[in-house]
Amino acid sequence: MVTKDSIIRDLERENVGPEFGEFLNTLQTDLNSEKPPIEQVKSQLETHFNLAHETQEFSRKNDNAPVDKLLTNYYNNYEVNVLEFVLQMGFSRDLSIPLNVWFVLDMISQLSTSKQDLPLDYYLVLNNSQTGKYSDFVRYLIYEAVGAEIHCFEQGSMPEQYRSSRWEDKVKGPALANRGPIRGNVGAGDRKITFHLLCKKTARMILVGDDRETDFEMSDRSFVTLLLDYYQRVGTTKKIDLLLLTNNFDTNMNNKLQQLKILESLNMLKSNCYVLDYQITVDQVTANFNSYVEGIPAFRRHEIANFLKKRKTPKNADELIFKYVGRWNICYQKKFHQGNISIHQISGYLD
């Protein structure tokens, strides 16, 4: 774990403003206090950075809607009934780093109290190039607030880092210890980061994503290795809901289908399947261009649907799409159906 002094030195070197170092120097948490550490950190963040004023401005720009509702809608783009929660922080240019951190702590606090009977896993993804210099600052605050270290994987090394030992990380300290492991990664990528494979002992859903532009491609070998590792942990009788996301149906999807067929032949895949073809970019021009050049060829759609025809699309599939693309500006969207199979094709951009 990085130290407070090393973070302050790095912040000074990056010339990001003295208030961040000043905050770390004044931050105090008392484990004997009636107020949980997470609330202590939130309160000090709010005071030191005058977040009350910022939230008021944020509310004013959004028709005076309650800030807690706005923030929830803004960030909580993964909300399904599985034992897994992803807090994806696409740091907004409208919000400061401290307010983003405050909200993540608030979300962790809410999830922990509302799901007391569940072992929760948290994945924190910082997906904006502007936040790289603040990564250690964020990790340190979360460590102080919840007693768990957030792990940092450098851009391009994600597939190699997903090894079985990764799922054995334990919470350091008593905070939220009864909630189960709290793990996370702080990526060094930019706003084009999409989704990555998240699998663990308790989850009912596995997400597979590729984004070649940021070198976060999950290789076929890694994909199969992790699925096998997952089944070894939970047993082959456990039902999995598989949400398969890819941004390249023509080539990569074909490889994934081959691997799924292998797993199915081994009787290791007893899941519902849902397919989303996404093409997300950071500007409207590229997104509009992708609307024309990207597409799922008819023969590929038939192959996918034929492979998946015995599986049922999750009832909340459309809801999942809404959650995932809620912050995207959609330029093109098309939906294909064949039996119970639902294939979404989306092109858009992040503002």
From Swiss-Prot:
Its main location: cytoplasm. InterPro entries: PpPFK_gamma, PpPFK_gamma_sf. The keyword Cytoplasm applies. GO terms for biological process: glycolytic process. The keyword Cell cycle does not apply. It is found in: Cytoplasm. Disulfide bonds: none annotated. Gene3D superfamilies: 3.40.50.11920. Pathway: Carbohydrate degradation; glycolysis; D-glyceraldehyde 3-phosphate and glycerone phosphate from D-glucose: step 3/4. Pfam families: PpPFK_gamma-like_C (PF22457). It comes from the Eukaryota. Keywords: Cytoplasm, Glycolysis. Coiled coil: none annotated. Signal peptide: none annotated. GO terms for cellular component: cytoplasm. Heterododecamer of 4 alpha, 4 beta and 4 gamma chains. The gamma chain bridges the N-terminal halves of the alpha and beta subunits. Structural subunit of pyrophosphate--fructose 6-phosphate 1-phosphotransferase. Not required for catalytic activity. Fine-tunes allosteric regulation of the ATP-PFK by ATP, fructose 2,6-bisphosphate and AMP. This subunit is only found in some Pichia species. This is ATP-dependent 6-phosphofructokinase subunit gamma. It comes from Komagataella pastoris (Yeast).
